[in-house]
From Swiss-Prot:
Residues 854-893 are annotated as: Disordered. The lineage of its organism: Eukaryota, Viridiplantae, Streptophyta, Embryophyta, Tracheophyta. One of its GO terms (biological process) is intracellular protein transport. The coatomer is a cytosolic protein complex that binds to dilysine motifs and reversibly associates with Golgi non-clathrin-coated vesicles, which further mediate biosynthetic protein transport from the ER, via the Golgi up to the trans Golgi network. Coatomer complex is required for budding from Golgi membranes, and is essential for the retrograde Golgi-to-ER transport of dilysine-tagged proteins. This is Coatomer subunit alpha-3. GO terms for molecular function: structural molecule activity. It is found in: Cytoplasm; Golgi apparatus membrane; Cytoplasmic vesicle, COPI-coated vesicle membrane. Keywords: Cytoplasm, Cytoplasmic vesicle, ER-Golgi transport, Golgi apparatus, Membrane, Protein transport, Repeat, Transport, WD repeat.
Length: 1218
């Protein structure tokens, strides 16, 4: 059983599948009817008008209707689109057990505990027939799918078949009086339109269910005698064919499968049983622990069943329907109807190759699961779940195509899965021993390869390689070297899809798609809410995949979307352009044409193929909010502008892309204060003073406008702003403008008019306006304020700008491929916006005299209409522009955009020094000094296998800052960076640049080494370790000049590595308080490190003392002997001789994992010896050795590189590149 959907609810008594939609109705014992989408797993609606349990429910085949019958004796017809009950049919006198629509006529058949079956016309809402004859509860009744028959089951131990042919002949509406008479006769006597054709007796207890076969003259029934009986009928009689026994309690429901020759039954014994209808034997049994089953329903078209039980329902399939297939070149090989077939994509021709052996067992799920094809040998491997997992090998002759009589005896074998790994070799997974068996085409074992971890399945991963699936990961396994080449965390992978060039792989699990490259380096992961079914790579590197109800795409960067909605699931085999080839669940090849323009457009953007993008914009019908938002998210608002008609959206996109002309045009159309305000901010950012002025005028933001005039030097316009503020009675604005102008007389006048006579007097007296001050003093009388004494007087006036500045100069940039020319309309609009802006700024916004007069008259001085009127009148006034006397030939044409005449053409910039430094350099230190940290990291990763860059971050920053100096210029100018070059000379050519001067040198490393030696001698081990690691982290970034120095750098790495390993072991030893043996081992391993002689003497003395205390005399004697060989001082030598004398001839009290006779190195992670001849892996940078299990982890010595990573080696000098 393959469970597709499950619900938890009250007891389910009735079920019905929708014939086309993925919906199912469930009627509950609580009186509620639920409508579920079993594909999405969501509850769509609930209907709860019945009073008491609802036992019967059924969808109409074509109309948006369903019918329900309950214990309230009512039959209700519902419209699920309007979510309401249309009408209720009354007539039954007891519980209603089942209801069903006729597949063709407007009839409903219902069975009831009142011992009758009724047929209703739901269009006229009347009962057209009452079938009487049962003498106990009628448990079910249903129409025959094709003939005019009804079958019913009753607790009177009989199954009855009713002939309703006469009723069908009367379907033409009779006259009203005849209809009324017929209705009365039907209610009283049951009518004669339906008569009993057969009475089937044979059950010993009450019959709970009976149903017709979809096509054959068969009936199946289930009863309280725990038996399922099969009946056959013809035109004259019906008889019992066989009895199926096996249920341990009452059989609740039984029916024929819609597509397979099987019978499905469920029972109160908590089981569902599947029977072979031809052999009449049990095939399979599914049990639940606590839930009795009550009802079954079969989908009329699909291979789906549903069963209702005490605590809900389940929707399930009996067998997998995914066809086994394998794509090879222009052909897909697949299995259908027990035949191996192939389909050519180019000709769309299907050919039958050879029959496939049928499995001997009769159980379910025996169909092929996977198929692998070898094109050179024309061999096919078919795997299935038969006998717990087995494979069959077929060698198909070239001339067997189309022959149905050809039957070859397949070579068989047991195995979880099998795939071809070479031309004439295939691999079989043996799960019991967790090994891969490589076999030849004679099915003989050639090689056995044990797998490093337990695997569930294997897939092809290139010649000689296998992709092995474990529970939570996938790995690529090399069969020859028996090595894992790559690993990726991907739980519960079900299917694997390689791209045609074997460069990319998609791993499909139940609800996720993981994309990786051929080395299993993760690229992206997509999560789906419903099941992922299949997928294929198209020729552009886009992964096309299907879920239960969609065809979707996944771009290389992880962006995804929907291409098409599906009615039924399909399995993609190939995607070419707009064509998707697939197999359906019946094994039929289908071609689906889709619109690939959306993901091709996004892919072109991703790969920066802007010529392709522009062509698609011109020629295709790409539109919609999804494309616009995608372009905006990916940083292409200028492209999105060409799709947008809505002015507000155009305005936002124009601001985002910096297109001020389109923003002005849209702002005029919208004419909203907020939009003008935002336009002003963007124009100010771009330094477009004219647009800022216009935006401030449209929003009547006079304070900002006056300040703009002040900082741009238009002091005459500030004067006009002062006048306008006065006319608006804005005293604060008027006073601010007077301050800007430095007009003391005006300030005194404003303060006097405002009634602030003391302030007016102080202002006049301070600025030497004696006449006005005397007049004000007379008015103030005795209230004259005192002026401060002893201060030097100065004129409070803003600095006078030397020239009035216009728009900021704009650099000419290369015209973007998306700018202009995409369509004639867009180009014309841009030019029109430019002209409109120029006209407005020429007259309306500069004509401040007219504006002030208009405001004095109570009008709006900044209306666009006013400006346009002035323009039409041909007035040149405003800001005295008409006073300029220009020669006739120098006059600017009226339609020329004034912005174009003031564009500053900057000199072409040269190549940045940082680019020169990195252009031909492969030295990571120089790239870091230039600020190209990403390329520096890539170089270190490639050369030394470095993965952890966190320790290098401060060194990168020091290098970059140390190779640059910064020069301050004017207060308004930016700081100028100056590159610091190595060996710079004043006479050198400006076009010749030397390498950067680096702050880290080899001589510094030697000084640091001496300091680390000193800390080691003094026993400051944490400090010494920090200094040694600092050296190890800095070495990849230094640059030396000669080959001799390169050798010295490599020697320094070895020295530091030995000390870091020894110090780490010593610190580890000091942490271990209780494990005395481990302390001795670590001390012994420390003596194996290559140290300076002074340090070696200290290490040997420490190890000797520790072993002597623990009575390991033989080992202590060995250390004493080594100490005497290293020229100890007098006290050390005396102590060593004493130990040697005391330990002579004695043995160790405990065994240590230390054999000084056998040469070894110490693992840098586990601190265990790796003796000569044992396998090990090393760090590509520092050369530390590790046990093989550490491969792929971060080196614990240098803390930078990955153990076992591929690396080209240290590059620290230009001489290595010559």
């Amino acid at each position: 059983m393959l469970t597709k959907f499950e619900t938890k609810s009250n007891r389910v008594k009735g079920l019905s599948f929708h014939p086309r939609r993925p919906w199912i109705l469930a009627s509950l014992h609580s009186g509620v009817i639920q409508m579920w989408d079993y594909r999405m797993g969501t509850l769509l609606d609930r209907f709860d008008e019945h009073d008491g349990p609802v036992r019967g429910v059924h969808f109409h085949a074509t109309q948006p209707l369903f019918v329900s019958g309950g214990d309230d004796y009512k039959i209700k017809v519902w419209n699920y689109k309007t979510h309401r009950c249309l009408f209720t049919l009354h007539g039954h006198l007891d519980y209603i057990r089942t209801v069903q629509f006729h597949h063709e006529y407007p009839w409903i058949v219902s069975a009831s505990d009142d011992q009758t079956i009724r047929i209703w016309n739901w269009q006229s809402r009347t009962c057209v027939a009452v079938l009487t004859g049962h003498n106990h509860y009628v448990m079910c009744a249903s129409f025959h799918p094709k003939e005019d028959l009804v079958v019913s089951a009753s607790l009177d131990q009989t199954v009855r078949v009713w002939d309703i042919g006469a009723l069908r002949k009367k379907t033409v509406s009779p006259a009203d009086d005849i209809l009324r008479l017929t209705q009365m006769n039907t209610d009283l006597f049951g009518g004669v339109d339906a008569v009993v054709k057969y009475v089937l007796e044979g059950h010993d207890r009450g019959v709970n269910w009976a149903s017709f076969h979809p096509t054959l003259p068969l009936i199946v029934s289930g009863a309280d005698d725990r038996q399922v009986k099969l009946w056959r009928m013809n035109d004259t009689k019906a008889w019992e064919v066989d009895t199926l026994r096996g249920h341990m309690n009452n059989v609740s429901c039984v029916m024929f499968h819609a597509k397979q020759d099987i019978i499905v039954s469920n029972s109160e014994d908590k089981s569902i049983r599947v029977w072979d209808a031809t052999k009449r034997t049990g095939i399979q049994t599914f049990r639940r622990e606590h839930d009795r089953f009550w009802i079954l329903a079969a989908h009329p078209e699909m291979n789906l069943l549903a069963a209702g039980h005490d605590n809900g329902m389940i929707v399930f399939k009996l067998e997998r329907e995914r066809p086994a297939f394998s794509v090879s070149g222009d052909t897909v090989f697949y299995v259908k109807d027990r035949f191996l077939r192939f389909f050519e994509y180019s000709t769309q021709k299907e050919v039958q190759l050879a029959p496939i052996r049928r499995p001997g067992s009769v159980s379910l799920n025996q169909s092929p699961r996977t198929l692998s094809y070898s094109p050179t040998e024309n061999a096919v491997l078919i795997c299935s779940d038969v006998d717990g997992g087995s494979y069959e090998l077929y060698i198909v002759p070239k001339d067997s195509a189309g022959r149905t009589d050809y039957l070859q005896e397949a070579k068989k074998g047991a195995g979880g899965s099998a795939v071809f790994v070479a031309r004439n070799r295939f691999a079989v997974l043996e799960k019991s021993s967790n090994q891969v068996l490589v076999k030849n085409l004679k099915n003989e074992i050639v090689k056995k390869s044990p797998l490093p971890i337990a695997m569930d399945a294997i897939y092809y991963a290139g010649t000689g390689n296998l992709l092995c699936k474990a529970e939570d990961r996938v790995t690529i396994f090399d069969l020859q070297q028996r090595l894992i080449l790559g690993e990726l965390q991907a739980p519960a992978v079900k299917y694997v899809v390689w791209s045609s060039d074997m460069e990319s792989i998609a791993l499909l699990s139940k609800h996720a798609v993981v994309i990786a490259n051929k080395k299993l380096v993760h690229r992206c992961t997509l999560h789906e809410t419903i099941r992922v079914k299949s997928g294929a790579w198209d020729e552009n590197g886009v992964f096309i995949y299907t879920t239960l109800n969609h065809i979707k795409y996944c771009l290389p960067n992880g962006d995804s979307g929907i291409i098409k909605t599906l009615d039924v699931p399909i399995y993609i085999t190939r995607a070419i352009g707009n064509n998707i080839f697939c197999l359906d669940r019946d094994g039929k090849n289908k071609l689906i044409t889709v619109d690939a323009s959306e993901y091709i457009f996004k892919l072109a953007l991703l790969r920066k193929r802007y010529d392709h993008v522009m062509s698609m914009i011109k020629n295709s019908q790409l539109c919609g909010q999804a494309v616009i938002s995608y372009l905006q998210q990916k940083g292409f608002p200028e492209v999105a502008l060409h799709f947008v008609k809505d002015e507000k959206t155009r305005f936002n996109l124009a601001l985002e892309s910096g297109n001020i002309q389109i923003a002005v045009a849209s702002a005029k159309e919208i004419d909203d204060k907020d939009h003008w305000y935002r336009l002003g901010i963007e124009a100010l950012r771009q330094g477009n003073v004219g647009i800022v002025e216009y935006a401030y005028q449209r929003t009547k933001n006079f304070e900002r406008l006056a300040f703009l005039y002040l900082i741009t030097g238009y002091m005459d316009k500030v004067g006009f702003m002062c006048k306008i503020a006065g006319q608006n009675n804005n005293l604060m604005g008027q006073f601010h403008n007077a301050l800007y102008l430095g007009d003391a007389m005006k300030r005194v006048e404003i303060l006097e008019n405002a009634g602030q006579l003391p302030l007016a007097y102080i202002t006049a007296a301070t600025h030497g306006l004696t006449e006005i001050a005397d007049r004000l003093a007379a008015e103030l009388g005795e209230n004259i304020p005192s002026l401060p004494e002893g201060k030097t007087r100065s004129l409070l006036i803003p600095p006078a700008p030397l020239t009035a500045s216009g728009d900021w100069p704009l650099l000419r940039v290369m015209r973007g491929i998306f700018e202009g020319g995409l369509d004639a309309t867009g180009k014309a609009e841009l030019e029109e916006d430019d002209e409109a802006a120029g006209a407005d700024w020429g007259d309306e916004d500069l004509d401040m005299v007219d504006a002030s007069e208009a405001m004095a008259n109570g009008g709006d001085g900044f209306d666009a209409e006013e400006g346009e009127a002035n323009e039409e009148d041909g007035e040149e006034g405003g800001w005295d522009l008409e006073d300029l006397e220009l020669p006739p030939e120098a006059e600017t044409p009226k339609n020329a955009g004034n912005a174009l005449s003031v564009v500053f053409v900057a000199p072409p910039p040269g190549m940045p020094v940082s680019q020169i430094w990195t252009q031909k350099s492969s030295l990571a230190g120089e790239h870091a000094a230039a600020g190209n940290f990403d390329t520096a990291m890539r170089l270190l990763s490639r050369q030394l296998g470095i993965k952890n860059f966190a320790p290098l971050k401060p060194l990168f920053l020091d290098l970059h800052m140390g190779s640059h100096s910064y020069l301050r210029a004017l207060a308004t100018a930016p700081i100028i960076p100056v590159a610091v070059e190595k060996g710079w000379s004043e006479s050198a050519s400006p076009n010749v640049r030397g390498p950067p001067a680096l702050v880290f040198t080899f001589s510094q490393m030697e000084d640091r080494l001496k300091a680390a030696y000193k800390a080691t001698t003094e026993g400051k081990f944490p400090e010494a370790l920090r200094q040694f690691l600092n050296i190890l982290h800095t070495i990849p970034l230094i640059v030396v000049d000669s080959r001799r120095e390169v050798d010295e750098v490599k020697e320094l790495i070895e020295i530091v590595r030995e000390y870091v390993l020894g110090l780490r072991m010593e610190l580890k030893r000091k942490e271990l308080r209780d494990d005395v043996n481990r302390q001795q081992e670590l001390a012994a391993y420390f003596t194996n490190c290559k140290l300076q002689r002074v340090h070696m003497r200290l290490v040997l003395g420490s190890a000797m003392g520790l072993c002597y205390k623990q009575k390991n005399f033989a080992t202590a004697e060995h250390f004493a002997r080594m100490l005497l060989e290293n020229n100890p001082n007098e006290s050390q030598a005396k102590r060593a001789r004493q130990v040697q004398q005391q330990c002579s001839g004695k043995k160790d009290s405990c065994e240590l994992n230390y054999d000084y006779r056998n040469p070894f190195v110490v693992c840098g992670a586990t601190y265990v010896p790796i003796y000569r001849g044992q396998k090990d892996v090393s760090c590509p940078y520092c050369g530390s050795r590790f046990v093989p299990s550490i491969e792929g982890q971060l080196c614990t010595i240098c803390e930078l590189a990955v153990v076992g990573a591929d690396a080209s080696g240290l590059l620290c000098s230009p001489t290595q590149l010559r």
